[in-house]
């Protein structure tokens, strides 16, 4: 069972180097790395050359846009399982071995998702369900993020490309939720995806340093996808009330930067949901 790992990257060198080190430490060796390099210079060439003899690396050049870069990578896959690591995540040494074993033992399932944690093993990159179970359109927001998703090749062959209007660098207001949109489409096509919270990938929690414009952009992406996939209003209201509650709590406790974060999240979700020209 071979893995195709699609790494879209721009602006990072040391993070990419550390990720490559984590790949080199994998106990399971049947994988290829497809690097979609969106830099305008050769900053990655030396470190890619350093690992080229350790495992297969395919270095592609492409313009900006996370979804566009991943779609370019999808054209080159040859593996049985496809994943989308972030350029600042780290794989634990036994990760691919664990995922390969799970797919071998669960031939009736088409995808596996895990959880994001910091290097101190605390949750990062959002809220996560504690219990394992099937992914559905309602819990998908708490059961997967791009770099914790593993899909059989059949899924990507059926679902197709990421929506290039969504995601960081898309040049649109919708700066997130491209992977959630992808999973919802996969579920709609009848594929079965499972969430295992013990499957963890290390990723820094950068919430405090994210710009408020980026926060709004992330919120707009979520709002856009909630509307596109016709979620019921009670569900939409839940995801509007959460940041509103965060605003109130942060104001009471005097955490004004946190208050601003939650407020901009709320504004973004509202603007994304009520955007003109919404597609369903």
What are these model-derived regions, one by one?
Residues 20-60:
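Acidic donor-binding segment of Leloir-type glycosyltransferases
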Residues 2-4, 32, 181:
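Cell-envelope/extracellular polymer assembly enzymes that use nucleotide-activated donors
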Residues 213-221, 227-280:
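Non-catalytic, C-terminal membrane-associated alpha-helical segments of glycosyltransferases
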Residues 146-151, 155-159, 166-199:
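A short, conserved alpha-helix in the catalytic core of glycosyltransferases
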Residues 61-77:
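Glycine-rich, basic loop-to-helix element that forms the pyrophosphate-binding segment
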